[in-house]
Amino acid sequence: MMRILLFLATNAAVLIVFNIILSLTGIRGQDAMGLLIMAALFGFTGSIISLLMSKRSALAATGAEVIEQPRNDTERWLLQTVHSQAEKAGLPKPDVAIYHSNDVNAFATGASKNNSLVAVSTALLNNMTRDEAEGVLAHEISHIKNGDMVTMTLLQGVLNTFVIFAARMIARMVANNRSSEESNSGIYFLVAMVLEVVFGFLASMIAMWFSRFREFRADAGSAELAGKQKMIAALKRLQAIHEPQEMDGKLAAFAINGKRGGFTSLFLSHPPLEKRIEALETSK
């Protein structure tokens, strides 16, 4: 429900800005509507394709192997724990995979709750107790339960649409104010490209802010599924080992770890570990 409300609210905001720009520039609504449709087509296509391919892409990027038949006690425990938590959360059983990495991490991905994946690194299994790992797994199950993959796709699609539309509308306004029609085309594309970079930069800040908000929700969900102390213990273990590195690409948005920074923290997908621990410790 929340992702639908977010989608509607964000689109309403885009339409408001759309009408403001039309009134300020005097550009005909028919032309602007065509541009908006084009921007939405480009803005959502990439995000939706990425979502549909997310599971396969994640397996390929990490070299993770899906557990079909457990080969040892660790794999058996991992499979049983994930499936038990999924059942408790009212979800279908996700695929479970292990990938080789020196980084203590885990992530969830997939196009829907019915086609999801939970993957953990070998370093996590080797460096965490089972209680701590259970907290991490519950965190990932919470991402799936909350529909975070779909929510981020919708948000990214709206942001992409706004970036393309706003950049090209402003570029059109600048180009139309030029006296020489011969240079209009070059000015238009130059301004559009520069503004798409600038607006894309700002859009990334919005997407990462929402990602950090979503991490707090997944932590709270883990506390409900596995117990608050297990999630706190897992986060403290991450602190004790090291401040984990950010994962590459889109996988970072659904991983367990996070690191802090000054201005760069605005572009991190996760809040600082100490803030996540504090939020859990002060929650009821």
UniProtKB/Swiss-Prot annotation:
Co-factor binding comment: Binds 1 zinc ion per subunit.
Protein name stated in the entry: Protease HtpX
GO BP, sorted A to Z: proteolysis
GO cellular component: plasma membrane
GO MF annotation list: metalloendopeptidase activity; zinc ion binding
Key words, A-Z: Cell inner membrane, Cell membrane, Hydrolase, Membrane, Metal-binding, Metalloprotease, Protease, Transmembrane, Transmembrane helix, Zinc
Broad class of the protein's primary localization: membrane
Coiled-coil zones: none
Gene expressing this chain: htpX
Family: Belongs to the peptidase M48B family.
Name of the top EC class for this enzyme: hydrolase
Any matching Pfam family: Peptidase_M48
Membrane topology, from the record: Multi-pass membrane protein
Cofactor(s) of this protein: Zn(2+)
Binding positions for Zn(2+) per the UniProt entry: H139, H143, E215
Active site residues of this protein: E140
Locations listed in the record: Cell inner membrane
Protein EC: 3.4.24.-
Transmembrane intervals: 4-24, 33-53, 147-167, 187-207
Domain of life: Bacteria
